[in-house]
Amino acid sequence: MKKIANFANKKVLVLGLAKSGESAARLLDKLGAIVTVNDGKPFEENPAAQSLLEEGIKVVTGGHPLELLDEDFELMVKNPGIPYDNAMVVRALEKKIPVITEVELAYLISEAPIIGITGSNGKTTTTTMIAQVLTAGGQNGLLSGNIGFPASQVAQTASSKDMLVMELSSFQLMGIEDFHPQIAVITNLMPTHLDYHGSVEEYAAAKWNIQKNMTADDYLVLNFNQDWAKEMASQTQATVVPFSTTEKVDGAYLEGDVLTFRGEAIMQVAEIGVPGSHNVENALATIAVAKLRGIDNQTIKEVLSAFGGVKHRLQYVGQVNEVAFYNDSKSTNILATQKALSGFDNSKVILIAGGLDRGNEFDELVPDLKGLKKMVILGQSAARVKRAADQAGVSYLDATDVRDAAHKAFAQAEPGDIVLLSPANASWDMYSNFEVRGDEFLAAFEELKG
């Protein structure tokens, strides 16, 4: 049995709040640590800090004073969104203070085995699929991590009979030391978050960290559609179980239109409850994990057939006058939009795209845009997206925001058409996160529905 860490009387600095920091602070306080929370937001605008102070936890807000680190902390638990070149983090590391993220903390305090899922795209859907299949098969799959349920919060009540099914971002994985999943999944890798990581190599290294402490008794599920996965398969101590839509592998693969695991037919592609080639990959990864956990084929098929998707991830919203609306606000990069478009007939799609300008062009998207009925373009990156539309020969309209875009797209639509929000860009030029952007699209749908 794993030894549970002892935090009693340990001086810990929690850097950054949001959901994970707040959860970590409460957990550490409950475990007897001497906790200080530091957050950049002013106290009067910081409900989380106010709540923690009322509970007797020390808070320092409105900035990150370096002198705070003179208090001889034994550990820093860093919000994953705070980069490692932050002055507080740099100083802590110089002072030899261990810096971890909240998922490492969750691992240290729980006996529950962990299934960790990471990747550039598809990780939320795959995480949700896995948790649902495990639970339906009699194993309690507890969703946690980057999916919106702080891992440390879920880990507090999890027993050794549960399975912590964690969605893990590259930001979280950079801060692991002892974190050890029983099964890990890397859905795919593509260049993203380079403003945080600095280079493709650093980003890939952060993702690869998921297998850092795995052994031959553990399983690493990799996407063999991508060459990097084949190349890296020999660089891990874990037992690799591949999945692929393009070739037969010793794992999960497509046999014609049949999702198959090591020769066992599981289900037809057409039976998956959500559309798109990316969801075939997500389903194959889920099948690999489920079979490794001993779940029967009928249960896997039933869950994946009934799977309705995840909010903001190619979510079917409904119809207005026989025009279907899909909310793929989580599409923050080109690959995600390519995957979304692959599930539809372009001639019926009115695509809403654009968002934060990170300086990248959209040439790779041009082949996928060809044949679209229309585009509605918005955001900082509009000029770059328009260049791609011009190259693809697609006409477009401008929009001021997502609500405006949804209304304009619907005005162009005919019965049988599809209005698809799949921006291929992050949301931060106009919205605080992709959820807020997606919620505005959902609200616009309700307006149009009347």
Curated annotation (Swiss-Prot):
Top EC class for this record: ligase
Enzyme Commission designation: 6.3.2.9
SUPFAM superfamilies the UniProt entry points to: MurCD N-terminal domain, MurD-like peptide ligases, catalytic domain, MurD-like peptide ligases, peptide-binding domain
Binding site for ATP: 119-125
Catalytic activity of the protein: UDP-N-acetyl-alpha-D-muramoyl-L-alanine + D-glutamate + ATP = UDP-N-acetyl-alpha-D-muramoyl-L-alanyl-D-glutamate + ADP + phosphate + H(+)
Transmembrane segments: none
Pathway: Cell wall biogenesis; peptidoglycan biosynthesis
GO CC field: cytoplasm
Database matches in InterPro entries: Mur-like_cat_sf (IPR036565), Mur_ligase_C (IPR004101), Mur_ligase_C_dom_sf (IPR036615), Mur_ligase_cen (IPR013221), MurD (IPR005762)
Keywords from the UniProt entry: ATP-binding, Cell cycle, Cell division, Cell shape, Cell wall biogenesis/degradation, Cytoplasm, Ligase, Nucleotide-binding, Peptidoglycan synthesis
Main localization (coarse): cytoplasm
Function in brief: Cell wall formation. Catalyzes the addition of glutamate to the nucleotide precursor UDP-N-acetylmuramoyl-L-alanine (UMA).
NCBIfam families tied to this protein: murD
Family label: Belongs to the MurCDEF family.
Annotated protein name in UniProt: UDP-N-acetylmuramoylalanine--D-glutamate ligase
Gene name in the database record: murD
